[in-house]
């Protein structure tokens, strides 16, 4: 084990000088003696000096402290011992339940599966959320992004998806909390505990209060744990199907931005690191399904200032199979989940994959909403009376569709007081098909707001009529 000494500390970036014949490799982990701090080598500056990122606070570090090269990259515990536990970026337990009893440890920097090992995803994954199942269906083993600005419901949507999929899905889940609120991580832990699925979830947190090194690497830690479950063959020679939840992928980029300038790189557009696309690619290419097992990932993506063309969300778009875009204008109407059905996309939107009935219904819903969007300006200036009968009918149906896209969530029960609803894909298609066919033109649009299936809307309309 070669030893070096710290020669410079600037924020989260630490320079360490080693003898020239034993300079550590890039991504080697260094341990600072008599401290808990691990450094990860990022650059070799020459003359035996390496520049590192500190995984942990650099408070209390000083020059001439000894750093020991471990000779390998950061390694974290993997396997069944991680289930039900909360760990930090280095795989150390932070739930005060004793050490993690893992059989093996893997390095967090790994190659993506080779081209011939990958397998395409076509099987649909039902979420129980109407707007998602109809307009941007998820694939089992696919990658999904939840895009939204501040406060439009990314985390609540993520929690509902976890509630609906992880609880129904008998496989394993990994949750990586990257630079988000500690409170949300705590809520997630209790949510899993209360629903008795904690023994199927591994949790890795590097939240907002952590130094940038932790936030930069915690996504890789969670991913490595998920990869182990996918790749480790059981007695039948198969890996497992794993769910990977990442909240929030933007903070991973942001942590890279924070240390990029300190590492001596020139900033690129909007001040992001010049290696933005590469860093995103390295992470995203590993989140994939192989012939062995699958990783289905759901990632929340913060959109700075609601600008989807910002380099960070724009770079993320390219890697995803489905994009769920949350809109502030829809949230302002009180329609939750605030998913924009015209802006959300899915690669599964193909009649050969989802079937003709689903595809046709989704297309007709989209056309109706698009027509309403185009007519909004005319309505704002001239009012509804100036529209043709055909246009009035389209507007009426579109407003019903908009309201029918809303749905009470299980995870929001404590706030709203109304019980959550899970709607099967079959019921979702049937309900929307009936609305665009005009079967419910006689019902008031309020009846469609915050209900589950179409039968509930009919029931609600009856109650409204009785009250009136």
UniProtKB/Swiss-Prot annotation:
Subcellular location: Cell inner membrane
UniProt key word Transport: yes
Catalytic reaction annotation: ATP + H2O + 4 H(+)(in) = ADP + phosphate + 5 H(+)(out)
Pfam families assigned to the protein according to its UniProt record, in alphabetical order: ATP-synt_ab, ATP-synt_ab_N, ATP-synt_VA_C
Gene Ontology cellular component terms for the protein in this record: plasma membrane; proton-transporting ATP synthase complex
Topology with respect to the bilayer: Peripheral membrane protein
Purpose: Produces ATP from ADP in the presence of a proton gradient across the membrane. The catalytic sites are hosted primarily by the beta subunits.
HAMAP family listed in its UniProt record: ATP_synth_beta_bact
Protein name (Swiss-Prot/TrEMBL): ATP synthase subunit beta
């Amino acid at each position: 084990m070669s030893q070096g000494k710290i020669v410079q500390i600037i924020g989260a970036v630490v320079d360490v000088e080693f003898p020239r014949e034993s300079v550590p490799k890039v991504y080697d982990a260094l341990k600072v003696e008599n401290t808990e701090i691990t450094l990860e080598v990022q650059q070799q500056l020459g003359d035996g000096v390496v520049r590192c990122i500190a995984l942990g606070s650099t408070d209390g570090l000083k020059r001439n402290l000894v750093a020991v090269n471990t000779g390998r990259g950061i390694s974290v515990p993997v396997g069944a011992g991680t289930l039900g536990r909360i760990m930090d970026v280095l795989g150390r337990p932070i739930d005060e339940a004793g050490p993690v009893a893992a059989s093996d440890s893997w390095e967090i920097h790994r190659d993506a599966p080779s081209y011939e090992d990958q397998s395409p995803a076509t099987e649909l994954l039902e979420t129980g959320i109407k707007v998602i199942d109809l307009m941007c269906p998820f694939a089992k083993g696919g990658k999904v992004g939840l895009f939204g600005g501040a406060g439009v419901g990314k985390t609540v949507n993520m929690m509902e998806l976890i509630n609906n999929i992880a609880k129904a899905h008998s496989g394993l889940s990994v949750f990586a909390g990257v630079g988000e609120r500690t409170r949300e991580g705590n809520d997630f832990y209790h949510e899993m505990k209360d629903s008795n699925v904690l023994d199927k979830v591994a949790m890795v947190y590097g939240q907002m209060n952590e130094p940038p090194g932790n936030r930069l690497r915690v996504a890789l830690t969670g991913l490595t744990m998920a990869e182990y479950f996918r790749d480790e063959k059981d007695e039948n020679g198969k890996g497992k199907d794993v769910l990977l939840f990442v909240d929030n992928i933007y903070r991973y980029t942001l942590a890279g931005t924070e240390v990029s300038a300190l590492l001596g790189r020139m900033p690129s557009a909007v001040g992001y690191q010049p290696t933005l696309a590469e860093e995103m690619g390295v992470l995203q290419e590993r989140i994939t399904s192989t012939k062995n097992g699958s990783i289905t990932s759901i990632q929340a993506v913060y959109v700075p200032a609601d600008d989807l063309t910002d380099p960070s969300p724009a770079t993320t778009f390219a890697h995803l199979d489905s994009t769920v875009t949350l809109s502030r204008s829809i949230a302002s109407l009180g329609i939750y989940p605030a998913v924009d059905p015209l802006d959300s996309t899915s690669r599964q939107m193909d009649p050969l994959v989802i079937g003709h009935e689903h595809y046709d219904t989704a297309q007709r819903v989209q056309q109706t909403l698009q027509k309403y969007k185009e007519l909004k300006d005319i309505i704002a200036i001239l009012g509804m009376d100036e529209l043709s009968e055909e246009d009035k009918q389209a507007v009426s149906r579109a407003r019903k569709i908009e309201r029918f896209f809303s749905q009470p969530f299980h995870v929001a029960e404590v706030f709203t007081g109304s019980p959550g609803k899970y709607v099967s894909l079959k019921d979702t298609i049937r309900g929307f098909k009936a609305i665009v066919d005009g079967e419910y033109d006689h019902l008031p649009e309020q009846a469609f707001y915050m209900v589950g299936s179409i039968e509930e809307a009919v029931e609600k309309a009856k109650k409204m009529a009785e009250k009136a």
